Amino acid sequence: AHFNTRFQKLEEQVQALKGLWTQEVFEYQGAHIQFEAAYSSPKPAQPLGPPILIGGETDHTLRRIARYADGWLPRARHGFNPKDNLARLEQMCAAVGRPTDEISTSVFGAPADLEALKGYQAAGIDRVLLPLPSSEPSEVLRILDQYAEDILKGLT
């Protein structure tokens, strides 16, 4: 997609897909996507279609998430504050009249640090994706066991 129109196209694609997934016959007339009386079958197993997940942390992205997404994938980069970022998402949801609890949050690349993750949990983060190396299976399994012992037990 062209850089300047990529997000407009994304919004239209999500709207068009949701319409096809939820209506027997659907037509769409957008600036970039247009079609008449289209059918989509079989319908997805979930009544509203597969969840739409969008990643990013900018205000533009959070507005798109508030309008169209079922889940948010922020990145746990330096300076990521779960409480502040969730508050920003709540503002965007309030602006479009949508309850924030309809949107799951899965932090990508969260730190494998129990105290940091307790802060994520306290802020209302649904789930985190912890880093794993591209290593031998035995090493990956060792790290997963360590996460289970050091982190999961400390969060429950």
Region locations from a protein language model:
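Active-site-adjacent structural elements that line small-molecule/cofactor binding pockets in enzymes
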Residues: A1-T156
